[in-house]
Structures are given as C-alpha cells and as structure tokens.
Amino acid sequence: MKKNLFAALGILMLVTIFFSPSAFALGFGASADYWIPTFEGDLRVDGNGVTGTEINLKDDLGISNENIAGAEAYFGIGNHEITVAYSQVNLSGAKTLNTEIKFNGETYDVADHVESELNTSMIDLEYQYKLLNFKNILAGLSFGIIAKVKYFDGDVRLNSSSDDTKEDIHLPIPMIGVGAKISLLANILEARAKVTGMGYSGDFFYDAMADLSLTPIPFLNIHGGYRAMYVKTDSISDVYAKMDFYGPYVGLLISF
C-alpha cells in the first residue's frame, strides 16, 4: 500500500514538473534599444609587407563618439530562449595629421588631412538555458547560462588627397556567460543583468549589461541601464585592434 502511495506521489511530481504551464510556456517579443556609449580604441593594419602604425582612433584621427541603435527579437519555450540582435556602428572623423601613419601598406604624411571611417554591423545569436526559473504571484527569480556568437562585419577606411585605402573586417566571436533576472511587484518592475565573454590566443572579448525595466501595461516594457563592450583581437589577418564601448542605454520591448 505504501509502495503504491509513494509511486503515485512520484508520478504526480513528475507530471507537475514536466507538464506544468511554465515547463512549456511560449514567449516571444521584439525590442528597440538606443545606446549612448563613450568610445576608445587603438588600431593597427599591416599590408604589403609593411608594419602599420598603432593608431589611437580618437587622438590621431579625430574619431568621435556616436550613438548606436539596435533591434532584437527573441523566442522562448519553457526554460529555453533564443535571441537574435542587430546593431550598426558608424564612426567617423577628420583630422590634419601631426604624425606619420602607415595603414594597410600606405603612408599618410604629417600635415595630410585625413578623413576616416569605421563601419561595422554587429549580429548576435544567443541561446540561454534557465537553470533556475522561480515565479510566484508577487516576485520571481531566474538564472541562466548563455552560449552566444557575436559577428562583426565591416570595414575601416582612411582617405586623403593622395591615398584612399580600406581594410575589411570579418570577425566571429564565440562567447559564454550568465544571465539573471529578479522580478518584483507582480512582474511590473524587474532588475536584469547579463555578461558574456571569451578569451583565447591573446584575444579577449566581453559584453555586459544591467538594467531596470518597467511594465506599465501588459505586453509593453520600458527599460534603461548601462552596457560595456570590449574587443581585443589580433586574429584577423593583418589587423590588430582594441576597442572599448561603455555607456547608458534605453529601450522599448513588446512581448507576448
């Protein structure tokens, strides 16, 4: 009798875990974000057997901060979530050189007026599995592990009256990380954080963000926080780069 009772309780627990609404709950949504980062970066591009100059992009070329708009879509089922994100980085500057610069095999002399551009698309494909996903009426907590690929697809260009040269950049970055979310006030207010990164063979990357989000009405979420992204690589042929973006962001999410 006791064995039958324990067996029945065990079956009931399994049914509750695997067939509860949260185990197979569907969710999807799309968001638009606006990031206002400070930018710092160094770049060296070799070419034609000539070692390039290590360029401070702000001081040497006059490249300034630019805000970055992005879009994101996600789909989730139970504890699994897939996210695709896209943003476009367009940086430019113009300056009369006070030092000689060698870039991609070409030489830009002192007193040359150089216009420069750094343009790249950032595409993120991310999978998150929620190890902990606790919800009740007034509060909730989730914690997950993340696997992600960030892909940079762009170019950097220097143009003067005598030379015009461009180097393409194609860089896929595999990353791993964690994400956490704390929900308060019946999911009206949430605190969220996420960090991913990877380091290997002298390369190092990370992308981290934290924000507060408010859901004033169903399906609509307004959020704001801080994001930092760092890229250091010499794995692209003839390109050596260190780039740092950090600053606040705001966004709007519609979810179902």
Segments from the language model and where they lie:
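Predominantly the C-terminal beta-signal and adjacent terminal strand-loop region
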Residues: 204, 208-255
